[in-house]
Amino acid sequence: MEKFSDAVSEALEKAFELAKDAKHSYVTENHLLKSLLQNPGSLFCLVIKDVHGNLGLLTSAVDDALHREPTVVEGAAIPKPSPSLQQLLLNAQEEARSMGDEYLSGDHLLLAFWKTTKEPFASWRKTVKTSPEALKELIIKLRQGSRMDSPSAEENLKGLEKYCKNLTILAREGKLDPVIGRDEEIRRTIQVLSRRTKNNPMLIGEPGVGKTAIAEGLALRIVQGDVPESLKDKHLYVLDMGALIAGAKYRGEFEERLKSVLKGVEASEGACILFIDEVHTLVGAGATDGAMDAANLLKPALARGTLHCIGATTLNEYQKYIEKDAALERRFQPIFVTEPSLEDAVFILRGLREKYEIFHGVRITEGALNAAVVLSYRYITDRFLPDKAIDLIDEAASLIRMQIGSLPLPIDEKERELSALIVKQEAIKREQAPAYQEEANEMQKAIDRVKEELAALRLRWDEEKGLIAGLKEKKNSLENLKFAEEEAERTADYNRVAELRYSLIPSLEKEIRLAEEALNQRDGRLLQEEVDERLIAQVVANWTGIPVQKMLEGESEKLLVLEESLEERVVGQPFAITAVSDSIRSARVGLSDPQRPLGVFLFLGPTGVGKTELAKALAELLFNKEEAMIRFDMTEYMEKHSVSKLIGSPPGYVGYEEGGSLSEALRRRPYSVVLFDEIEKADKEVFNILLQIFDDGILTDSKKRKVNCKNALFIMTSNIGSQELADYCAKKGTIVDKEAVLSVVAPALKNYFSPEFINRIDEILPFVPLTTEDIVKIVGIQMNRVALRLLERRISLTWDDSVVLFLSEQGYDGAFGARPLKRLIQQKVVTMLSKALLKGDIKSGMSVELTMAKDVVVFKTKTNSVV
């Protein structure tokens, strides 16, 4: 028989390489032994560990023996197998035949080594005190009835240890986070596991609601003994799909590995429970060219009840993969894991707070926990509690931890001040005049003073860092003592429990309390080690782009004078400006309805009166740039099918994967001004989509994903009823009543929009035609924009009243509003100035004054210092 397992073939190759590298003429059994010991995960080493053999001692003895081997000169022949190695392999083959195996594996080699009289193995074997017969019995037991019938069979022994992680051991070592809440789901899981057949729970829930945590909670309960007798002393293994797939080169190798895991679970006779996270990945795994997938390997064992298995998957994957396979579905008992309530999520965070405080070395306030849950629930709508709230706490704590390690702002400012003084002193030293000597002395005194202040600040910083580091160390020690107390209670070491519970732990808790008080009582602290609600709000703002931080004084002042700011750009529309300003103010202080958008407005009026300009002005005030506005020209949505442009194409159509222009824009920038320009041009189907957005603040796209629209401000513009509006204003004059104006345009609105659409609009705002006084103000606004562009070239621009009068008279048209005015300024002013700049008549540093000469705008220049 010359069939070797993959592991033995690899070991023989390495043995030849070792002999060649060491310039040995023969490959001996010691070279083979050395190569086998270099793979601690091999069957050879695993069996030695099971008989409590000292691998380190054996490795040292083999190294010494190889050093004593004679070497040959350069260019000698390739080393040949020694007679003793050949005899060892023959003995191993005999062991393989006696055990009915087709392939020679590591355990056969170990049995052959066990009978050898060659040193150093013979001397080392005496330290183990295990007979060859006992070793053979152990190997047979270890194999659990499997035979070496393939080259990879050796790799698949001990499949549980190789391809799974033991959660029970991790729980016993204190490496799992505490599982708070979820008692009902854990009890239901235990109930299903206690059944005679089909004892396989399937945890189904959205990502981040705590499915994996339920499995970890079960492992913690098993360790604590808080389970029924049927589950006591059980081991919970989690399947590592990465390890299972990695390195599976040949067809059938993946299935063989999975089979070895299942065999290990079955052979334990109920002592092992297998947890498969993302169980849907097994459906279809390994299935090529009509071969069975991995899920089919599970079915027989699941049906018999010999395999205790807990699965976990999301609702979508369960419907997509598991429900399609009815035979697999009926072998699992579904347990639905719902998202916890806000109160339960806060309760979960309280349980995890200590772990995060110890890891980051910070203090997390109760307010921060509440803020993390409430703000994540309101603003991060595409994820689920408690995962998103835990992530907020973790990121906020890491931000504080990073700041503790960075240079505090007061020290940074002092260092900059010191650098500036030293540079100034060096400049003064270069001046030889006696008059500068006194100034140099004063400068030296200032440098000495700043150095003293900097030294004092650094000393305070070092002290605070030391206190925080000491506090973190004490909290770590406290956690270790609490873990030791639990361990002692499990092993019934009650003397140790009493010592820890009533002496060591209270003493350390008192030290921590005193250290925290000492840290809090320090005046003028340089380091902030507390995570509060303001920091949580900052992290939410960084994630979503929604400014949810508590309003700063500057922002409050800006919102109070919002009307004045808007009136600087939009003239003659007091109704619209007041209504929009009130909506934004109520939203920013948190008093608006959280289940609806910030505001839904319909701007009605003739063209060129400032409807679109007001939307642009809002975007600039809220986001500091006009481009932040999401604008849709509704003339592009006149066909019935064009609704797919907004929410995405349906499945099977071109562009399905790309998403919709509205849904994707709001997903990326949920806090936006959304403008639907000329809404009356859109098809009726578009209005049906908008109903859902305006009422619930939710948009469902073509992929059934919900997009949060509750932080957006929606503005629609329309020309409906503009003629009636113009006629009414012409009769009544400039001062008009808003309700009276709306009553004029109401019939036209009802003819075009459905009642349910009108009912969802917060306010319909009429834009009245502009008066002559309004046009004069607009001339000033437009001319100021031209002047600002020239100021960038260091050119000052002024104009007299005659220019304003000419432009306002020539640029106003009742039918077109203020738009012709912009074109007139472009033709009469901007074009003239552009030509003068190109000719060199106007240069940088000049002042330009515009005036009228025979109905033509002309300019005068004079040289002036313009900054």
From Swiss-Prot:
Residues 340-545 are annotated as: Linker. Residues 4-69 are annotated as: Repeat 1. Residues 158-339 are annotated as: NBD1. Pfam families: AAA, AAA_2, AAA_lid_9, Clp_N, ClpB_D2-small. Gene3D superfamilies: 1.10.8.60, Clp, N-terminal domain, P-loop containing nucleotide triphosphate hydrolases. One of its GO terms (cellular component) is cytoplasm. ATP 1 binds at G205, E206, P207, G208, V209, G210, K211, T212. Homohexamer. The oligomerization is ATP-dependent. Part of a stress-induced multi-chaperone system, it is involved in the recovery of the cell from heat-induced damage, in cooperation with DnaK, DnaJ and GrpE. Acts before DnaK, in the processing of protein aggregates. Protein binding stimulates the ATPase activity; ATP hydrolysis unfolds the denatured protein aggregates, which probably helps expose new hydrophobic binding sites on the surface of ClpB-bound aggregates, contributing to the solubilization and refolding of denatured protein aggregates by DnaK. This is Chaperone protein ClpB.
